[in-house]
UniProtKB/Swiss-Prot annotation:
It is found in: Membrane. This is Interleukin-2 receptor subunit alpha. It holds the Pfam family Sushi. One of its GO terms (cellular component) is membrane. The gene is IL2RA. One of its GO terms (molecular function) is interleukin-2 receptor activity. It is a single-pass type I membrane protein. GO terms for biological process: immune system process; inflammatory response. It comes from the Eukaryota. Residues 22-81, 120-183 form the Sushi domain. Disulfide bonds join C24-C64, C49-C77, C51-C79, C122-C165, C149-C181. Residues 83-112, 186-213 are annotated as: Disordered. It comes from Canis lupus familiaris. Residues 22-237 are extracellular.
Length: 268
């Protein structure tokens, strides 16, 4: 029942707030041995406030709100314990608000909630205490996701691998990122091959092409000479054969003429 209420709340929020952005209906593409992340989130993006086992959420979701000049996350996520010992209304706060605790690695990489680098976009929201290990976002049209291969895998082709949620023929769809991840163990010499491929053009790299151009010219010359000699020998053989056939024809005609004269002399 709770997921239905959550979706109803998200749709109500979008309708009441006057957002004209559309939520992406489908999930982002799932590539084998690859993960994706969003560097920034467009206004209208919704994040579920999911808690780990033994805790329940007080607010259902966070949403990225703002305008073209400023955007930030609203409705901070908080989790409350459901165990009998802690049912005194104690609510856990953000890790950075608790004294004596070191910030997690994710916190150190995440800027404050109101700090935004790109205008009209929200940054990754900071973690909250007893947060679920997996975050569920509801993206809007125009959101860009960046894909990269997992550890131990390498991309078959270099270049940016992005997926963008677009509206195509009235339906929201994610573009397919051009990324294929292959195990690094299958290509042990991939780094050397890539290094030779990515070598900048210069005197050292261009010299092999200069040295190979001369032998290629000699090869073409030798081939042409060979073809000419072959044509010459063929023509010579044809001429000799024609002369032989001509001599044979003369001998045959002479023999036939001699036989006719001999027959005539006998009849007389």
């Amino acid at each position: 029942m709770e997921p239905c209420l959550l979706m109803w709340g998200i749709l109500t929020f979008i309708t009441v707030s006057g957002y004209t952005t559309d939520l992406c209906d489908d999930d982002p593409p799932n590539l084998k041995h690859a993960t994706f992340k969003a560097l920034t989130y467009k206004t209208g993006t919704v994040l579920n406030c999911d808690c780990e086992r033994g805790f329940r959420r007080i607010s259902s979701y966070m949403h990225c709100t703002g305008n073209s000049s400023h955007a930030s996350w609203e409705n901070k996520c908080r989790c409350k314990s459901v165990s009998p010992e802690n049912r005194k209304g104690k609510v856990t706060t953000k890790p950075e608000e608790q004294k004596g605790e070191n910030p997690t690695e994710m916190q150190s990489q995440t800027p404050p909630m109101d700090e935004v680098d790109l205008v009209g976009h929200c940054r990754e929201p900071p973690p909250w205490e007893h947060e679920n290990s997996k975050r569920i976002y509801h993206f809007v049209v125009g959101q860009t996701l960046h894909y990269q291969c997992m550890q131990g895998f390498t991309a078959l082709h270099r270049g940016p691998a992005k997926s963008i949620c677009k509206t195509i023929f009235g339906k929201t769809r994610w573009t397919q990122p051009p990324l294929k991840c292959i195990s690094e163990s299958q290509f042990p010499d991939d780094e050397e091959l890539q290094a030779s491929t990515d070598a900048p053009a210069g005197r050292d790299t261009s010299s092999p092409f200069i040295t190979t151009s001369t032998p290629d010219f000699h090869k073409h010359t030798e081939v042409a000479t060979t073809m000419e000699s072959f044509i010459f020998t063929t023509e010579y053989q044809i001429a000799v054969a024609s002369c032989v056939l001509l001599l044979i024809s003369i001998v045959l005609l002479s023999g036939l003429t001699w036989q006719r004269r001999r027959r005539k002399s006998r009849t007389i």
